[in-house]
Amino acid sequence: MERIWLKHYPAGVPADIDVTQYSSLVELLEESFKKFADRKAFICMDKAITYRELDEMSSALGAYLQSKGLQKGARVALMMPNVLQYPVATAAVLRAGFAVVNVNPLYTPRELEHQLKDSGAEAIIVLENFATTVQKVLPNTAVKHVIVGSMGDLLGLKGVIVNLVVRDRKSTRLNSSHR
């Protein structure tokens, strides 16, 4: 199979990673934070975060999760699309010693309830766009901690606009009488 994505890799980024080099994903992350501190780690909506920023934000979020009394190995659900918050949350959960439970943000309440019960998730990090689904099933799950973020939280000034648009879009509905 041709690996066409390789032509988009920046100079110096290896095409392959020796998976035996690291004992865990956390070890890989920690090395990357040091080695590539000033390089872009992720880009979303033209906003980039560096490995240093990813290190700082995930460390802070991981410490917050630990402060909630979750035990090592606890399951933390992540209910968000591909936005900058996702890699931050993933790194935070792993660095804090917890397990990531990926949750489709488009799940129905029934599907979400099943996933949360089946996984035994004790916490969930969710974007506000999907928080109403979480709210509907929360009493029927083991989830004790809910962390809610907004779509534009990591986008700077653009994020303020994105959050306003997302919130306005949620509050307005198409009026069929105008047809």
Label each region the model flagged.
Residues 22, 26, 171-179:
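Alpha-helix-centered segments that form part of catalytic cores
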Residues 1-2, 33-38, 176-179:
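A short, compositionally biased
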Residues 67-68, 95-176:
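Structural core segment of the AMP-binding/adenylate-forming
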Residues 28-35, 164:
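Residues that form generic nucleotide/phosphate-binding pockets
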Residues 15-17, 48-49, 76-77, 99, ...:
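Short, contiguous strand/loop micro-motifs
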Residues 20-21, 30, 38-83, 87-91, ...:
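Conserved AMP-binding/adenylate-forming core of the ANL superfamily
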